[in-house]
Structures are given as C-alpha cells and as structure tokens.
Design a protein with these regions (language model features):
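Metal-dependent phosphoesterase core characteristic of DEDDh/y 3'-5' exonuclease domains
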Residues: 4-5, 75, 79-81, 88, ...
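Entry/capping segment at the start of metal-dependent catalytic domains
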Residues: 7-112
C-alpha cells in the first residue's frame, strides 16, 4: 500500500490545492488529507460524521521530543548511567513523560479511522474528483503559541493547539456522546495520548500524577482507550511483538509498511491502526481485547508471565 499527501503550495506554484484536480488514485493508495487552520472545522466535522461507521480512531502525535520511531514513545530526559526507563516505577516514568510533553511542542497529529474489520473511509480528495480513495488525516500545528508559519495543509497556515482543542469538542469528535461507541488507539500511549491530551486542553500542562492523567483520559475519551505497545506485549507466551512501529508493521504484514519513507504523522497513524487491528484479529479474536482497555505501557503492571 502506498500513501499520497495532498498537494501543497510549494508544489503547485502557489495555486491552492483546492483549485487543482489530483491524480487519479490507484486502488491501493491511501490519501493523506492535510488539515490546517483553513479547513480544520470542516475536516473534523467530516471525521465526526464518519464515526458511527468507522468507530476506531488511531492517533499519532509527531512531536519535537526526539527523532526515530521508538524514541517517539520513550523519554528524552537524561537519566543517570545504568538507569533504564523500563526499570523505573510507573510514577517515575509518568513524571519523565510529563516533563517532555509539557516542554516540547506538538508538530503534527495523525488521525486514522477504521471499522471493526480495519477498513478505511473512502473520500474524494476534492468534490469534483472522479474517484474516492481510502483516506487518513494529518493536522499541521504551529510549533508554539504566537508564532506564525505556513504549511501545506490545504494551502493555509498551521492550526494552533487552542483551535484544535475547540474544533475537536465543537464538532463532537471528542464528546461524552461518543463514550462507549468510539475506540481510541495509540502506539506508545504514554507519549501519544499524553500529547493528544495536551491538544485537547489547548496546550495546558499534563496532570501532576499518573492517576490524574489516567482519569483525564477517561474523562475526555471514555473507557475504550488502547495502547498498541501494551497490547502487543500481552500476546500469548511464545509470541514476541516488541520493537519500533515500522518493524511491527512489517512483521505483521500491515500494508502501510510498504509505503516509502519518510513517514509522517498521517502514515504512522495508519501503521499503528493496522498493527492494532492485526494483533486484535490474530491474538484476541476469542478472548477479546477489552481486558486491556485503559492500560498504558509503563503505567500499568505486566501480567505474571511477562
């Protein structure tokens, strides 16, 4: 599966992408819908309208706390020699994550919707396009408050965290009405859900304690929240699903793994979605995956056999 991003002013000679007819999509393409300040509300309204049919929402937060796929879920704060993040208690791991999430800006937010079978919504890139393509979203965000910048998202400037927070609630994408109906997914949830919570609060610092953080997630998203990394570590004995997101996608045969890099938030949310759906179908088809709802890697104790 390959992915294509929407055209940007840099590649269209300054002509807004909405004035151009995109190339005819191939059946295996996934179209990355770039979202900016200009089209933030209508795109999130589209997402809200699709939730009854596509109730699985995977988010991927691309932030400035460090590069690399695995680094996106691990702490950036320097630790004493010989001390590993994995060996720290949950309270300490949360404290390190809070330092990073509070200090670093959220650059992009990838959003992928799918149904219970992993199928993506098909949308036209522009109203007059001849064919629809499977689509995911990538929200371009200002790196900090008060700064001004332009991005390729729909030909307009990047959105602010406050604008994103308002749009998520105003459109009903995040609403008590969706509790129990929408399943939220992230890979390495301590960081990606932490940055998503930062977005939902318009850039406010994370709660002071692990318990308050988990309560805030439940308050905004409800009880159906899954961390792909936590779930991947809880598959039956003899199965090892550890490593970066790109590695897991390739190992499990996720179509997103075939896309050429560099991946951005949109592609990574797609990969995380496909990895989660494959783990769910392969290892939790009989017992169900709901036992792991609300559990975040690093914040919850592993089962006895881990």
């Amino acid at each position: 599966m390959s992915s294509r991003r929407a055209p940007t002013p840099a590649t269209t000679g300054g002509v807004p992408p909405s004035a151009l007819r995109p190339p005819r999509p191939r059946g295996s393409d996934v179209f990355i819908r770039l979202v900016c300040a200009e089209n933030l509300m209508p795109e999130l309204a589209t997402i809200r309208a699709l939730l009854p049919q596509y109730p699985y929402v995977t988010v991927y937060a691309e932030h400035a706390a460090g590069g690399g796929d695995y680094a996106d879920a691990d702490g950036r704060v320097a630790l004493p020699p010989g001390v590993r993040v994995e060996g720290l208690p949950a309270a300490a791991r949360y404290a390190l994550a809070k330092i990073d999430v509070d200090a670093f800006p959220l650059l992009r937010l990838g959003i992928t919707l799918c149904d219970a079978h992993g199928r993506l919504p098909s949308l036209r890139a522009v109203p007059w396009a001849a064919a629809a393509a499977a689509s995911v979203w990538q929200v371009e965000l200002l790196p900090s408050r008060g700064s001004s910048s332009s991005s390729g998202g729909g030909g307009g400037g990047a959105a602010t965290l406050r604008a994103l927070a308002y749009a998520l609630r105003a459109t009903g994408v995040v609403s008590p009405e969706t509790w129990g109906k929408v399943t939220w997914v992230a890979h390495g949830g301590l960081y990606h859900l932490g940055f998503f919570l930062k977005a939902l609060t318009g850039g406010a610092p994370l709660p002071d304690t692990r318990g308050e953080f988990l309560a805030a997630l439940r308050g905004y998203l409800g009880g159906r929240v899954f961390d792909v990394r936590y779930v991947a570590a809880r598959v039956p004995r003899g199965v090892t699903l550890k490593g970066p997101l790109a590695y897991l996608a390739a190992l499990l045969g996720a179509p997103a793994a075939a896309a050429r890099g560099p991946w951005q938030a949109g592609e990574k949310s797609l990969a995380a979605c496909q990895v989660f759906m494959r783990i769910k179908g392969l290892y939790f088809a009989w017992d169900g995956i709901n036992m792991h709802a609300g559990c975040i890697d690093g914040l919850h104790a592993p089962p006895p056999w881990s």
